[in-house]
């Protein structure tokens, strides 16, 4: 329940409450919960340090902390400077414990990908193919990379995928443990 109280504080304190509330829309929450269910299928023997690229307002981080995955710490980066304070407020108890940090940062210029066990990018549709390829080259080969995209055609989605096959082929990641999609 503590997280819900921090979520409400974050919404109340947000400069753009409507935009912050968008992170709680049914589709947003369902896709994040679905992703966590997929992650539970992966064998993990130790507590992981996770980097979330395009972490927005930090909802994914809170859901990860509340899952039964072994999460040590999470850093959430987002290019939008308005997200940092809201994400830190949403995850206040984890921030206080030193387990969460939100940072205003462009994933294309981020320098510390090597400091994490798992890199999660749930905003692939916001990257052109060229940007995605550049971003992928920044990540050390020994990392677990988790990707999520969608097929929503809206102006800010510069690269929506028409289906899972297109996404898998454009991901350029092998081996792929188990590509799957939320219906």
Where are these regions (language model features)?
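S-adenosyl-L-methionine
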Residues: 1-45, 79-118
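Conserved class I S-adenosyl-L-methionine
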Residues: 45-58
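Structural motif
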Residues: 53-55, 121-125, 148-151
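Conserved SAM-binding loop of SAM-dependent methyltransferases across substrates and taxa
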Residues: 57-70
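Conserved SAM-binding motif I beta-strand of class I
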Residues: 72-79
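A short SAM/SAH-binding and catalytic strip from SAM-dependent methyltransferases
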Residues: 116-131
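C-terminal substrate-binding/active-site "lid" region of AdoMet-derived donor-dependent transferases
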Residues: 128-183
């Amino acid at each position: 329940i503590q997280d819900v109280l921090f979520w409400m504080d974050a919404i109340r304190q947000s400069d753009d409450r409507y935009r912050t509330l968008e992170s709680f829309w049914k589709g947003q929450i369902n896709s994040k919960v679905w992703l966590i269910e997929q992650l539970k299928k992966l064998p993990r023997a130790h507590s992981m340090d996770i980097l979330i690229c395009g972490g927005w307002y930090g909802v994914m981080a809170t859901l990860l902390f509340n899952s039964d995955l072994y999460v040590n710490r999470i850093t959430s980066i987002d290019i939008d400077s308005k997200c940092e304070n809201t994400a830190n407020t949403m995850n206040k108890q984890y921030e206080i414990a030193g387990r969460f940090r939100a940072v205003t940062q462009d994933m294309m210029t981020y320098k510390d990908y090597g400091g994490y066990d798992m890199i999660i990018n749930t905003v692939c549709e916001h990257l052109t193919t060229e940007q995605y390829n550049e971003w992928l080259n920044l990540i050390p080969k020994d990392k677990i990379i988790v990707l999520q995209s969608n097929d929503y055609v809206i102006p800010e989605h510069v690269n929506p995928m028409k289906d899972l096959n297109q996404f898998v082929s454009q991901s350029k990641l092998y081996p792929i443990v188990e590509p799957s999609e939320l219906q």
